[in-house]
Amino acid sequence: MEKALCLSWRMGALPGHVEVSREGKAALTVTTGEASVSCSIFFAGKEKPLVLEAAAKAEEKIALRFLPARLELWVGDALADEEWPFGECLYRGETPHPAVTVAEEERAEAPAPAVTGTFTHAAGWRPGGGVYVGDCMPFVHDGRYHVLYLKDRRRHHSKWGLGAHQWAHISTGDGVTWQQHPMAVEITDPMEGSICTGSWARIGGTQYLYYTVRRSDGSAAPIRRSVSRDGYHFTKDEAFAFTLSDRYDGPSARDPKVFPGPEGELHMILTTTRKDSGRGCLAHLVSRDGERWREEAEPMYTSPSAEQPECPDYVAFAGRYYLFYSIRGVAHYLYSDGPFGPWQVPREPTVPCARVPKAAVWRDRLVFAGFLPEEDFLRYAGTMTFKAASAAPDGQLVFEDWEM
């Protein structure tokens, strides 16, 4: 049961601007235009408010909901915008105008079905409603190609720039028709600034999602996980959390990739920085059971500069091993005859798939998924994009468009 404080009114019932103040400072403002509504919620110690906005027609019902870890703006029966709070909210439930109803709600959410919707052709797709596709994390299970992706609003500017990303989930059996599944990992605690990129792993009969959580207070990012039996409904494992040792920069640790080793052990690589040299790297950890992890003496890869190799990926493919990472959104790869190197640099080391793509082996090819910004390439999030690759006899990848 989830409790919410709900403010509701009809478009046209309020003057253009109403405000609730506390100790001489704005706590809540609601601004309405002919076809729009904007709500600003203020917090102690924050210079800027969280702002939720939506288009709305005359007489439509507007609802602003305050939940412990989320703010929602509804227009009619549609969720139009979201934000994610942290800290002391200055608004305490006062009525901003006689036309506004303020009430407490209790919402019992039934488990979502495994398939919540369908669509065709994921290339160029995004969910709509102000939601964009961020980093993609593909995997293959039971013959289906799955993509977990960061659900993005405001191009990484939600929650005062922390991102407030959550994991959404789609899959396909033929590359044409796609199913939408329940949210895989959501923000459920105000201390969670963003659920960062990670990876899927199957250990025994259980499926896991490994990820780091960017902390709202800037402290070291813990490595966390969620657990599922059916692969569609995941639950956070609240007992599982650890951080890297002080050899590495803890707050920047992110993007764990978990994969099986040649002797049945599990390996994890993740983005961070070596404190001794200041160079970006992929820290390397090993586990026998997925529960207890130990750091290897050396990273899997160390960058020649301070730039961090982001969104790492590791794939065994066509008799060789491939290590991927992204620099400024552009993916690079290395390959080796052995599982952990020595790594060779291909003649053309970049992956021609925007941005920060990761891959899974499906139908004898590597199929990459990434995101393509709709305007400025350097702006975060956009629509989903794909690329496929096969391996040449010498191990270098040959890329092609992915079309079904």
Predicted segment positions?
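Glycan-recognition/cleft segments
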Residues: 17-41
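Carbohydrate-active catalytic/glycan-binding domains of CAZyme proteins
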Residues: 2-6, 10-13, 17, 38, ...
